[in-house]
A protein has these predicted regions:
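Low-complexity, intrinsically disordered export/secretion signals at extreme N-termini
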Residues: 1-69, 73
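Repeated scaffold domains used in trafficking and secretory/extracellular systems
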Residues: 90-97, 143-152, 195-218, 262-270, ...
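Residue-level signature of beta-propeller blades and closely related beta-rich strand-turn architectures
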Residues: 111, 159, 166, 174, ...
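Beta-propeller blade signature
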Residues: 116-124, 173-189, 236-246, 287-296, ...
């Protein structure tokens, strides 16, 4: 299997503010030269990744991760989610997906060598059931044309979708399990280039829009794909919507709808009932209502509001609503960012869980039930 052999696990029973640091890991092997890389946000030198050769004597699946308790919220005790297992091996977490049928949380990580690792964990125990390196379309050389950043991940249970700045990669669950079992790179069933058309404008303001696959989510037969943009650069990110093929899981390229203007510095996105929910680099949780039909996908950005209630930390990434809570993945616990974090915050090494009633839902005139629906 594609093995993270150097990460011993332990169970944490004490109450903590954020996350318990995992044990130190052995130095990874030097991998081959990296493929071209496209960044979503601010960059800096990254640490070397973990050895993914699959050669080793330990179990291919990590020991159960800790699920510790956070300080009480206004609604009572709010335990944190699964531990982000691969932080100390040089991996930086990005996307968060949720498989409701299996009660599993998916996390994508990128490494210094521009590899992308998919980790699948049990929602309750945090134990890792699958880890696999993601590749491209070529069955003989799947490492060619592979994703290099893995900014977003989502699943409908049968197919797993990964956004990677310039493309959307589709994998079958069957292929991911096969590759994990055999210690090989998972082969994509589809790689669709995200359009980079010139002259894309915000329909409401005429502002230039940046089109990329920085983050994504899927819901009710559609894929929603958004792009990151810096604050104050005179541009904004675009969010597109694509219909999914029911049989193959592929994105239907000529079904594109939009764009909707994304918030500045958007990093993660999920779809709730009639709205998009974004995490941003300036610690917001932006609620954006939209209108959609078989032929259109539009939104009035004047209706968007921040419902974070001050509960989002720096370096927020992927996001989902799970069992009446907002689950947020952070990159602040990674080797790349932990020393850059404002000292008033602790690096987050577990997924954050926020009860929906603790958010500023009144600002959006919604209830927890409406968000969860």
């Amino acid at each position: 299997m594609l093995l993270i052999t150097s990460i011993p696990r332990r169970v944490v029973t004490t109450t903590q503010t954020d996350a318990t640091k995992p044990l130190a890991t052995e130095a990874p092997a030097t991998p081959p030269a990296p493929a071209p890389y496209f960044q979503d946000g601010l960059e800096a030198a990254r640490p070397s990744p973990v050895n993914l050769t699959g050669l080793g004597t330990k179990s291919a699946v990590a020991e159960p991760a800790s699920v510790a308790s956070a300080p009480p919220s206004s609604s009572g005790s709010a335990p944190v989610g699964p531990e982000l297992l691969h932080l100390d091996a040089g991996w930086t977490p990005q996307g968060q997906g949720y498989d409701a049928k299996r009660d599993e949380v998916l996390t994508t990580y990128y490494s210094d060598e521009h590899d992308v690792l998919l980790s699948v964990q049990d929602k309750g125990s945090g134990s890792e059931s699958l880890q696999v390196q993601l590749g491209g379309l070529d069955p003989k050389h799947p490492e060619e044309g592979k994703p290099t950043h893995g900014g977003g991940v989502s699943t409908d249970g049968e197919f797993v979708y990964v956004s990677d700045t310039r493309g959307i990669y589709v994998y079958t669950r069957e292929e991911l399990e096969r590759a994990a079992k055999t210690g090989t790179v998972a082969q994509a069933s589809q790689v669709m280039e995200v359009p980079f058309p010139e002259g894309v404008k915000d329909p409401a303001t005429g502002m230039d829009l940046v089109s990329a696959g920085s983050y994504m989510t899927v819901k009710d037969g559609y894929a929603y794909i958004g792009s990151y943009s810096k604050d104050g650069d005179g541009k904004a990110g675009a969010v597109w919507r694509y219909k999914l093929d029911e049989e193959t899981g592929s994105l239907i390229e000529d079904s594109r709808q939009g764009p909707i203007r994304a918030p500045d510095r958007a990093q993660g996105m999920t779809v709730v009932d009639g709205a998009l929910l974004f995490t941003t680099g300036d610690q917001k949780l932006v609620y954006q209502p939209f209108e959609a039909s078989a032929d259109s996908f539009t939104a009035n950005i004047d209706n968007r509001v921040d419902i974070s209630n001050g509960l989002i930390d720096p370096y927020a990434q992927g996001v989902n609503i799970i069992d009446g809570e907002l689950w947020v993945t952070y990159e602040s616990g990674s080797e790349k960012y932990r020393d850059k974090l404002n000292p008033k915050y602790e690096p987050r090494e577990h997924i954050q869980r926020i009860p929906l009633e603790d958010l500023d839902l009144a600002a959006a005139c919604v209830t927890p039930e409406q968000l969860e629906g």
